[in-house]
Amino acid sequence: GMHGMISQVEGLAKALDLEFIHEKIELNSFWKLFPPRLTPIQDFVFKNKINNKFDIVISCGRKSIIPSIYLKKKFKSKIINIHIQEPKVSLDNFDFVVAPEHDGLKGSNVLTSKGAVHYLTNSELDENENYLKSRISTEKKIVTLILGGPNRYYDYNNQVIDLSLIHISEPTRRS
């Protein structure tokens, strides 16, 4: 969902050590219904005007593809545009595309990641390494599982989570 995409954009901006602002650029209601490959790259498709000038645009997900391409076409080499996730439009629309390795996306401007990009840094992890030490036993191995929330493809209700945990724990029980 929206938070996951913002998290990925922030993560990449932090990794690049960029100062950033969030600019929410929405397509108007009519153009939200169309896939990016069928949406015109024109300012009339936007609900709001784009007033800021940017050096780097980092977009993530389907709804941000058109604004990113629009800004790149408008400002050409004055900006760098980076899209996170498989855009399902020509990769030539972007300076860089960051996609998880499992998507199998190939191109001269494609950078692959192991899983999703996130905003946690090594220094933040190091600073907080003792956070859970008083709450967990050090005598046994700890496995951490981070589950995402519901989206239009998956419904993470309690039953699905319970079944997932049972499925994951079965190999452990056998050993």
Regions found by a protein language model. Give the residues of each.
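Single conserved hydrophobic/aromatic residue that forms the stacking wall/gate
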Residues: 166-175
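Glycosyltransferases and closely related glycan-assembly transferases
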Residues: 9, 17, 66-80
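A nucleotide-sugar donor-handling region in carbohydrate enzymes
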Residues: 91-157
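Short beta-strand elements of ligand-binding domains
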Residues: 60, 81-86, 98-100
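Charged helix-capping and loop-helix junction motifs
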Residues: 157-164
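Short N-terminal targeting/anchoring amphipathic segment
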Residues: 50-61
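Structural motif
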Residues: 55-56, 80, 96, 142
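N-terminal pre-catalytic "stem/leader" segment of glycosyltransferase-like enzymes
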Residues: 1-46, 52
